[in-house]
Amino acid sequence: MVVVAGMLASCSDSAEGVWLGECCNDTIGGSKSGVKMSVKQNEDKIEGILILQDNLYGSGHFVGYINGKDLTIRSEGDTQTFVNITWTGKMKDGVYKGTYRVEPTPSAALLGKQVQKGTFIMRRQ
């Protein structure tokens, strides 16, 4: 499951569109990887695809809802994901930035995956 959480700057801001950016993994020496999020928004409902481009965690489909200024997105990852990812940040003026935390599922922990955290920034394309 991939979990994305953040804040919208105002109710009029939309998360709709393609977001491209970069993650910096503080746990393993600041290594960087690309991230892409494709979002469709229908009023307060959000859905889309999140792809981590380093192939360490795969991709996942997510659905979520906006409640006022809060944006919370939770998703089930595909069979190659095996982790829960929480993104916490702010979306404002076409930029989404903040921190993330990766927690392995029990099956991924058995394969040696560990908790990781870092920062991210994505820009609307």
Show which residues each predicted segment covers.
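Central antiparallel beta-sheet cores of small beta-barrel/beta-sandwich binding domains
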Residues: D13-V95, T99-Q125
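Bacterial N-terminal signal peptides
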Residues: M1-G6
